[in-house]
Amino acid sequence: GLPCGESCVFIPCITTVVGCSCKNKVCYNN
């Protein structure tokens, strides 16, 4: 998917509210 401009190394993706998920320490949108 497309990168959401957020990392999830130390904290979860806040962008999960818009459909993003954590993959390889970076938040992606499927």
UniProtKB/Swiss-Prot annotation:
Disulfide pattern: C4-C20, C8-C22, C13-C27
Keyword Disulfide bond (UniProt): yes
Keyword tags: Disulfide bond, Knottin, Plant defense
Pfam families to which the protein is assigned, alphabetical: Cyclotide
Reported modifications of this chain: Contains 3 disulfide bonds.
Transmembrane domains' residue ranges: none
UniProt keyword Disulfide bond present: yes
Cross-link (Cyclopeptide (Gly-Asn)): G1-N30
InterPro entries attached to this UniProt entry: Cyclotide, Cyclotide_bracelet_CS, Cyclotide_sf
GO biological process: defense response
Function of the protein: Probably participates in a plant defense mechanism.
Entry domain remark: The presence of a 'disulfide through disulfide knot' structurally defines this protein as a knottin.
Family designation: Belongs to the cyclotide family. Bracelet subfamily.
Name of the protein: Cyclotide cter-G
UniProt organism field: Clitoria ternatea (Butterfly pea)
Lineage summary: Eukaryota, Viridiplantae, Streptophyta, Embryophyta, Tracheophyta
